[in-house]
Amino acid sequence: MSQVKSSYSYDAPSDFINFSSLDDEGDTQNIDSWFEEKANLENKLLGKNGTGGLFQGKTPLRKANLQQAIVTPLKPVDNTYYKEAEKENLVEQSIPSNACSSLEVEAAISRKTPAQPQRRSLRLSAQKDLEQKEKHHVKMKAKRCATPVIIDEILPSKKMKVSNNKKKPEEEGSAHQDTAEKNASSPEKAKGRHTVPCMPPAKQKFLKSTEEQELEKSMKMQQEVVEMRKKNEEFKKLALAGIGQPVKKSVSQVTKSVDFHFRTDERIKQHPKNQEEYKEVNFTSELRKHPSSPARVTKGCTIVKPFNLSQGKKRTFDETVSTYVPLAQQVEDFHKRTPNRYHLRSKKDDINLLPSKSSVTKICRDPQTPVLQTKHRARAVTCKSTAELEAEELEKLQQYKFKARELDPRILEGGPILPKKPPVKPPTEPIGFDLEIEKRIQERESKKKTEDEHFEFHSRPCPTKILEDVVGVPEKKVLPITVPKSPAFALKNRIRMPTKEDEEEDEPVVIKAQPVPHYGVPFKPQIPEARTVEICPFSFDSRDKERQLQKEKKIKELQKGEVPKFKALPLPHFDTINLPEKKVKNVTQIEPFCLETDRRGALKAQTWKHQLEEELRQQKEAACFKARPNTVISQEPFVPKKEKKSVAEGLSGSLVQEPFQLATEKRAKERQELEKRMAEVEAQKAQQLEEARLQEEEQKKEELARLRRELVHKANPIRKYQGLEIKSSDQPLTVPVSPKFSTRFHC
């Protein structure tokens, strides 16, 4: 670590003025030397005219070791406040005293810096380059501010600007050499210097305050409103002009220019002069007050975005397409989801809600190693290592137990041990199927006649019915007479029950006989053959092909069909005319029609008349007085009953106390009866159990006696059978005959 610290160096400015060094014993006389020097420099700069002597009059300081007070910002490198304050001073004042004094002080410090023997780091070299650029930029700004009238009156041409820019590097080179020599002589004081990043004058921008920014925004809004009004007026004129009137088309700009907006403009801080002065406050009185609002969080860097020179109206894929969630699913998720008020808050959220203790971030000057988070992102290794795999294989080998078989003696005898070869079976000989159905099909085909019988036509005499009456034309149906009905216009939707008149009688089904066959052809009945179901291969393809062929064949036959030849009928006999009699229809008789409304009206009038008569009769009956029969005379008169009082009550005039029964006594009696019944039941159960026990004991005794009897061996007596009677045989005795083995006597 010691080597690292020796090689590492950080040129950071100090954020404070070390006034402790001014209180040394040797510097007691020169306490105000720094302030005097600053005043002298300002007087010299004010006394001189032009910008030529601005940087020439560099007076050495009274004491080389004197601590220089350099006003620096809070941030070490990227300090926006210093830039803003410097730019405001350059714009407002012609000659900024603070800038000149700081430059001279830096120049004086850089002269006395000795050459550094250590190797310059990349960071130091970059910082020094920035310092040199900033110095040159400040010089240019001072020149511009010193002569504002000349710059406004006479603007240099492009060629002059280019020539001036070409000369600048030469001056910069000489300035770089001087500063490098001066910086090398004072390594200690270089640490106290402030490095400010420089920007080229072309890219330099004047920062505006928040009020100016708000004014600009309001101006832009007003301009947009004016443009919108103009467009609306044009549209109004176009609408009023109509379709036929020629209207001047407004030229719309294709490219839409958008101003550059930097995030750093919104981070402008107030000038220290404009800030409120420090006020002494009583500490104890401020304890109970509410804390101030949390410190303002610093915004990040400006995010670079592409320039939208022309905006399209087409919506993107993300805007149009969104995952569809049905309403039922949303309702189900809502019921399943626990509300946030029931969740416990984490401690991290509470920490974030608390206000930060330190508003000003502390800058650490010591080098620190970066806190890399990659080691925490390492995932757990899921695959097994070789050592684990070998250990698992070893466990499997140990678990497996090998059991040896007996030695086969044939191995020692010699010769290969081969399994017995199975006997080779002969190949299967195919045998054709002799099906009965094939036989029947062959027999049927042989029975079928190859050619149909030749049919000859023989004419027959003409039937006489044709001459007598019309043949083949059906009789005309006699339609029923139309019955007129009153139209019920007011009762269209009323459904009426069908009346008997409306119900049509079901006509009997006419059984038609089959047509008479042709008498010229002799009738030969065909006896249906006794057939069985034929098993045919099931295939849609063959059936469809066959149907298609039949269809094509039928179409061809219809197309090639010959035109039918005309054949005249024989002439009838004109001697006698046998025409059918002409049927004369009866004339339609006019009948008066009866409307439904008339019938309903008559019925209603009749019912209304009956109701009126009934009401009048009831009113007359109510008006006539009719007395009810007198039943009081026949009833018995009312006789009050005398109250029966006891003798004691009558004498003393007091009531005798009747006997009473307490509910406790009644319950006690009921309880005694219940206990008595329970005792009887218990005694009965005990008696039954005792009887069952005695019966079981008797059964066991009987079983033991039976077993003892069966176990004792007792011989069975000799059985007596019926005597056997021997009868003599009736057959004669066998006569012995010698066998004839010789073949001499055979013929």
From Swiss-Prot:
Function: Spindle assembly factor required for normal assembly of mitotic spindles. Required for normal assembly of microtubules during apoptosis. Required for chromatin and/or kinetochore dependent microtubule nucleation. Mediates AURKA localization to spindle microtubules. Activates AURKA by promoting its autophosphorylation at 'Thr-288' and protects this residue against dephosphorylation. TPX2 is inactivated upon binding to importin-alpha.
GO biological process: activation of protein kinase activity; apoptotic process; cell division; microtubule nucleation; mitotic cell cycle; mitotic spindle assembly; negative regulation of microtubule depolymerization; regulation of mitotic spindle organization
Protein name per its UniProtKB record: Targeting protein for Xklp2
Tissue specificity as recorded in UniProt: Expressed in lung carcinoma cell lines but not in normal lung tissues.
PANTHER family reported in the protein's UniProt record: TARGETING PROTEIN FOR XKLP2
Residues where Phosphothreonine is found: T59, T72, T147, T338, T369, T499
Major subcellular site: nucleus
Sequence ranges of Basic and acidic residues compositional bias: 167-181
Organism: Homo sapiens
One Pfam family recorded for the sequence: TPX2_importin
List of residues that carry Phosphoserine: S121, S125, S257, S292, S293, S310, S359, S486, S738
CC annotations in GO: axon hillock; cytosol; intercellular bridge; microtubule; microtubule cytoskeleton; mitotic spindle; nucleoplasm; nucleus
Database matches in InterPro entries: Aurora-A-bd, TPX2_C, TPX2_central_dom, TPX2_fam
Compartment list: Nucleus; Cytoplasm, Cytoskeleton, Spindle; Cytoplasm, Cytoskeleton, Spindle pole
Positions of crosslink type Glycyl lysine isopeptide (Lys-Gly) (interchain with G-Cter in SUMO2): K477, K500, K641, K740
